[in-house]
């Protein structure tokens, strides 16, 4: 049931957090945005409400599978570790056991999420690249009337990607399989230690928030533990998340980065060390409500099925 509960929790979470995820990606990949509000205002002015939901269909279709694998892998890995170390799955796992299982859960996710992350980032940043292409130079404007009676129509390029599936097919055709796994090195580093932090912090906070005489926290305890676990996980994940987003968005036009280290060095040299924490506040603001919903849905499904089976 961990797989089913994880799937339901993941879908609920993505429904809550996707608009803020779009803003986060734009802030991380476009240097022109000076603040969260600047990005929100600019996105709404150019694309209206739909601009915050670009590329949503693919995450909604795949997040149930990914979340299911994450929670299922964590649970089964933890059970195998306890059985191997202590001879029984009923023994309370140590923090090291939880950390290792969480890390394994994060690493497994990468093989499923990398292609969808590439498509999501390309679609989320596509509108900005189109806007830059439409912006004419002074010299072009001076001759435009003679060449084209309707400059606006001539300057409106069609989007390169018409949707998530078209984006995946286009990337695979133009860049090969490596294109679908672009940024996966940064994604591995992000997911490994962030999911170790995620599950460890949730387990510790749940234990602290469990009322005396009970074996598990109430709904309020789950809300607080889940939200805080999400915030802590994104706090450690943000530097690699910035690099991941830049590497994955780099497939559009001339490529700037040769790899993970080159991206880190170039980004820090051009924008300073603070660039690695671009979107941190937004990540944390998004993580709290999203992971509150994820863990409440996850725990609700588990407790419901346990009640029906007993």
From Swiss-Prot:
Q: Where are the Solcar repeats?
A: 1-80, 93-208, 217-304
Citing just one GO molecular function, the answer is: acetyl-CoA transmembrane transporter activity
Main location, first listed in the record: mitochondrion
Reactions it catalyzes? NAD(+)(in) = NAD(+)(out); acetyl-CoA(in) = acetyl-CoA(out)
- SUPFAM superfamilies documented for this protein: Mitochondrial carrier
Where is this gene product found? Mitochondrion inner membrane; Mitochondrion outer membrane
From the record, give the transmembrane residue ranges.
3-23, 49-69, 98-116, 192-212, 219-239, 275-295
UniProt keyword Transmembrane present: yes
One Pfam entry name: Mito_carr
Cite the entry's keywords alphabetically.
Answer: Membrane, Mitochondrion, Mitochondrion inner membrane, Mitochondrion outer membrane, Repeat, Transmembrane, Transmembrane helix, Transport
Q: Name one GO cellular component term.
A: mitochondrial outer membrane
State the membrane topology: Multi-pass membrane protein
The protein's superkingdom reads: Eukaryota
What job does the chain carry out?
Mitochondrial NAD(+) transporter that acts as a 'metabolic gate' in hepatic lipogenesis. Provides NAD(+) substrate to mitochondrial SIRT3 deacetylase and enables its NAD(+)-dependent activities in mitochondrial energy metabolism. This triggers downstream activation of PRKAA1/AMPK-alpha signaling cascade that negatively regulates sterol regulatory element-binding protein (SREBP) transcriptional activities and ATP-consuming lipogenesis to restore cellular energy balance. May transport other mitochondrial metabolites having an aromatic nucleotide and phosphate groups, such as acetyl-CoA.
Q: Which family does it belong to?
A: Belongs to the mitochondrial carrier (TC 2.A.29) family.
According to UniProt, the name of this protein is Solute carrier family 25 member 47
Q: Corresponding gene?
A: Slc25a47
């Amino acid at each position: 049931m961990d797989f089913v509960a994880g799937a339901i929790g993941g879908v609920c979470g993505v429904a809550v957090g996707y608009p803020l995820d779009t803003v986060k990606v734009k802030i991380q990949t476009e240097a022109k945005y000076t603040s969260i509000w600047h990005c929100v205002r600019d996105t709404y002015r150019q694309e209206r409400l739909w601009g915050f939901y670009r590329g949503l269909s693919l995450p909604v279709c795949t997040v149930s599978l990914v979340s299911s694998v994450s929670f299922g892998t964590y649970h089964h890995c933890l059970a195998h570790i306890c059985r191997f170390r202590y001879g029984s799955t009923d023994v309370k796992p140590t923090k090291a056991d939880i950390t290792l299982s969480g890390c394994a859960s994060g690493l497994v996710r990468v093989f499923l999420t990398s292609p969808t992350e590439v498509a999501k980032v390309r679609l989320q940043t596509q509108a900005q690249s189109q806007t830059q292409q439409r912006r004419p130079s002074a010299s072009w404007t001076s001759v435009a009337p003679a060449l084209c009676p309707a400059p606006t129509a001539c300057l409106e390029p069609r989007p390169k990607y018409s949707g998530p599936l078209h984006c995946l097919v286009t990337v695979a055709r133009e860049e090969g399989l490596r294109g679908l796994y672009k940024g996966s090195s940064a994604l591995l580093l992000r997911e490994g230690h962030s999911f170790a932090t995620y599950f460890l912090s949730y387990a510790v906070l749940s234990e602290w928030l469990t009322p005396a005489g009970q074996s598990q926290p109430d709904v309020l305890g789950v809300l607080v533990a889940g939200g805080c676990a999400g915030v802590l996980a994104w706090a450690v994940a943000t530097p690699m998340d910035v690099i991941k987003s830049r590497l994955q968005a780099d497939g559009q036009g001339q490529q700037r980065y040769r790899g993970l280290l080159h991206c880190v060095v170039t980004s820090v040299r051009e924008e300073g060390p603070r660039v690695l924490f671009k979107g941190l506040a937004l990540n944390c603001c998004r993580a709290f409500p999203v992971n509150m919903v994820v863990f409440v849905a996850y725990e609700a499904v588990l407790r419901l099925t346990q009640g029906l089976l007993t």
